C-alpha cells in the first residue's frame, strides 16, 4: 500500500507507525494474520520456497504456539557490492551476501490484527497474546537494507567478514523473472527506474 504522501518529512510515528496502523484499521478484518514489512524486506523460508510458503509457516508455527499473537521474523541483512541494476533489475537479484546470523533486534512482525492495541515497527503493542520469534530455520526476513544505511559499495574486508555468500533466493528470482516475462502484458509494470 502506497504511503509516500506521508514520507516527507519522514518520522517513525508519522510515517511507519501510521501506515501500519492504517493497514490494521482498513484491512485487519479481512484475515486472521497480517504482516508489517517494507519494500526492501522479504520473508524467506530456507525449507520452503513454493508459493504460499509464508501462509504454511504461519499456520504450522501458530498451531504449535497457540499463545502467540505476533510471530517475529529475524533480520538478515544482504550487503556488499550489488550487481549492475541494468542487468539485474530485481533488487533481490543484485545482492548475494548476507550476515551470518540475525544482524540486529530489528525484527518484523506477522500478527493477529484483532490482538493489536497499537501498531509499531518491530513489535506491536498487543492487547492479548505474546510475541514469539520464528526459528530462523523456518522463516526469516531477508533485508536488502544496504542502499539506505550501509551505502552499498565494494566488498570491503569489513563487509566480507560479517557476511557469507547466500544463493538461496535463486529459485525465487528465476520464478519471478519467468513470470514477469510470461505472465504480464509488459515488463514495464515491474521494471521501473523511478516513481511517477
Regions found by a protein language model. Give the residues of each.
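Intrinsically disordered, low-complexity acidic segments that are enriched in bulky aromatics
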Residues: 1-3, 67-78, 82-84, 90, ...
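Active-site-proximal specificity loops/subdomain of glycosyltransferases
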Residues: 1-36, 44-45, 49-50
